Amino acid sequence: MQLGMIGLGRMGGNIVRRLMRAGHACVVWDRDAAPGAALASEGANAAGDVALLVAAMSAPRHIWIMLPAGEATERMIATLSSLLAAGDTIIDGGNTFWKDDIRRAKALKEKGIHYVDVGTSGGVWGLERGYCMMIGGDKPIIDRLDPIFASLAPGRGDVPATGGRDGRDPRVENGYLHAGPNGAGHFVKMIHNGIEYGMMQALAEGFDILKHANSLNLPAEHRLDLDVADIAEVWRRGSVVTSWLLDLTADALAKDPALEIGRAHV
């Protein structure tokens, strides 16, 4: 399947690479020519500007935007809406505010252009691990894009399905969800990010306390010299706080046990 990608930063570029590994054809553009040239050397078609990207694609076109939320994305959607034709699709894979998705989808629909919002989680590790995706939009368009989502998703791997899921959408177990209409994808991702930040803050607070358990401000008999790297490692193995975020914390502490945890409060 052919996909256009606008924005070739740390996530956009790796999304293209993962798609090309799966046999998809990618037409790419970034305002910085260097990442486009790098991807061209790997098999992508690097366009000189947005209009040339659109011209290089076959109808119906599917163009994924991976830009910072806000003005940059708004400007790009306005540009694309003047270049695309009825039946084409714009996919926003960034962290757009979900109410903006609803507004955009309504405006684009008047031109016959489809809009899909994709909350994308996986970061720079997604190239190898895959991306968890929370998707909002009309079902026929989501179904048309399924080969793209299936290639980007992590797949089932060795994670067992939760019991009692008989009859539910099996794509969820592969790592991507059609959450609902436009806005639903980014709404779910917004809540995901809030949970993530809370977990990160809890880890930071906990390890900060452990790191300073030998503070000279404590009575001598209450001081504890603790190895925070070893604590992180043991918690990875069977504890109820096991998580990928803990894995990343353990990796960072193993490389630098004196890592500055940061302020333990907000």
Please provide the spans of the model-predicted regions.
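NAD(P)+-binding Rossmann beta1-loop-alpha1 motif at the extreme N-terminus of oxidoreductases
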Residues: 1-62, 87, 124-127
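Hydrophobic residues in well-ordered beta-strands that form the structural core
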Residues: 28, 48, 65, 92, ...
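Beta-loop-alpha module in the N-terminal Rossmann-like domain of NAD(P)-dependent dehydrogenases
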Residues: 63-79, 97-100
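Short glycine-/small-residue-rich Rossmann-like dinucleotide-binding loops
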Residues: 67-69, 95, 120, 153
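Rossmann-fold NAD(P)-binding glycine/threonine-rich loop
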Residues: 86-89, 93-143
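Helical "substrate-binding/catalytic lid" subdomain
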Residues: 130, 134-136, 144, 151, ...
